[in-house]
Amino acid sequence: MERQDRNQIIMLGTGYATATHCYNTCFILKTPDTMLLVDAGGGNGILNQLEEAKINLSDIHSFLFITHAHTDHILGVVWVVRMIASLIKSGKYNGTFTVYGHEKALKVLEWICRMTLPAKFTSLIGTSVLLHEVKDKDELSIGDIKLQCFDILSTKEKQFGFRALLPDGTTLACLGDEPYNENNKNYVENADWLLCEAFCLYKDRDIFKPYEKHHSTALEAGALADKLNVKNLLLYHTEDKSLATRKANYTGEAAQNFKGNIFVPYDLETINI
């Protein structure tokens, strides 16, 4: 992939867990010198998304962050590990590949890999493929990106988000795929960018039932962005029944509460940040 001088978010997928008309939510956070893959969706569709985005696996040099162990976020990671292990074995990948995640996410990933991948690949775990456990409040330097990790305090599944400081001073807060918890205010408030789930439109809440699934709506995401004084709001992890009108309708609903910039990307869309 050609070097870019701007920071970018490359949305590989934007859909919720059972989406069939778009890929599950995952993205690349890219600076001029670092490419961080955040989650990988629910299967080997991640390989197609990377190919469509013209990103070689060798471009994702060293870094992947898993928010949590749900199938639509972690199973694609197994495929990324498999393919990178193959590149390492064939001498086409230099250095190590590090997967960051909390204890449970890494435990699940390692178990699936060891139960399903050939020994020639799993033998690399711990040497060339490194599983780096992060804890609540940990601070990391991933390439030229500085991350502050935080437990989103989910009551459904242990999940971590992060606040990223990019080399030009831009700040980005990722809440994973569940609603904001007030205990994490310091990580999110005044961020330049907020990445937030919006399961559906508020007007469609009786159809998609976001609240019983620990999710929220575009209307509430807009209110959150306004409350936390962020500059730019990016919505993801949505239903996939309204893709033709999603960008306009989700933007319009979030804008009822938030006057900053709102982005509702399609799969494979790149946003300059």
Q: What are the functions of these language-model segments?
A:
Residues Y180-E269:
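Cap/insert and terminal regions of metallo-dependent hydrolase folds
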Residues A17, T71, V99, A105-L106, ...:
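Short histidine/acidic/glycine/proline-rich micro-motifs that form metal-
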Residues N44-T98:
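Active-site metal-binding motif and surrounding structural segment of the metallo-beta-lactamase
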Residues L37-G41, I60-D72, H102, L172-E178, ...:
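Active-site neighborhood of phospho(di)ester-bond hydrolases with catalytic His/Asp-centered motifs
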Residues E2-A53, K158-D177:
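Conserved beta-strand hairpin/beta-sheet module of binuclear metal-dependent hydrolase folds
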Residues A19-H21, E133-K203:
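Active-site-proximal loop/helix segment associated with metal-binding centers of metalloenzymes
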Residues I9, D39, L50, H68, ...:
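Divalent metal-coordination and catalytic microenvironments
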Residues Y93-K158, P167, F263, D267:
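Metallo-beta-lactamase
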